[in-house]
Amino acid sequence: MATVNLTELVATTLRNRSKDYADNVSKGNALLTKLSSSGNVKSASGGRTIVQELEYAENATFKYYSGYETFDIAPTDVFDAAEYNWKQAAVVVSASGLEVNVMTTGKEATLNLLEKRISNSMKTMRNNVSIGIYSDGTGSSSKQITGLQAQIADDPTSGTVGGINRANWSFWRNQIGSAANISSTTLPGLMKAMWLACQRGPDVAKLIVADSIRFTDYWDSLTTIQRITREDKGMMGWETLAFLSAEVVYDGDSGLPAEHMYFLNTDYLFWRPHTSVNMVPLDRRDSLNQDAFLVPVVFAGNLTMSNAARQGVIFDSA
């Protein structure tokens, strides 16, 4: 009977399940779930940085005129771009010679071992990317994803995001709302104020993500009749409450900072994986000094933003 080639099975299965990796990561994070359902997963084909076009000023040539009065044709810089660094991540599926040649016998046992290793690696990638999405980007010596704590900051008047210095450019500052000892009594007022601060005409927050404390405060503030969940196919698999037209989501064990609630206009947030480096396996590597082999699964990309003023965060100042 032919010996089952575990190393080839690992490589082949990982190649076939590359899309499963990407989907698993997206579905394991509330923000990525929303971005995926709304078409804001935009792959990037390469370059020194990930360039995200943005709009930061109105066109100054607008004017009322009469008869033969001339138009204002002066050039106006309306669009600029933020530049985000590529962030890379990897998880490794490995097996030793003992597992391949001694302990694993038969195709069924081989496939079971393979499935467990792949499942574990998918969960590991999902959990760590999710933590990165909500991070301040300083983890792993600043190699972590540029997450919400960096882009929608408690202090948006300082720091550089996407190559733009917020101390110099007020258009690149998010909205903030804070109070000491926020409770279920005081939170609704802060949420109303934040909603209005982030709104521009019909342009409003689409998703509100909160840690367990702020989510519970909001939940407790609602009457039974108000505790409405909406049938939104874009957030399938997530239990949500409603605040006006936005879903309110608790994203547990995700790295959300304590006592924070983010108001996200997801029209201006993007998940930008590299076109060909999005949870894909590399070629098998054989260890030089061990009886083992490994297959890395790699990712390159980042979270980007095109409009900071339409985003906001509520946090406790105590």
List each language-model region with its residue ranges.
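Flexible, glycine/threonine- and acidic-rich loop/arm segments that mediate assembly and lattice contacts
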Residues: 1-318
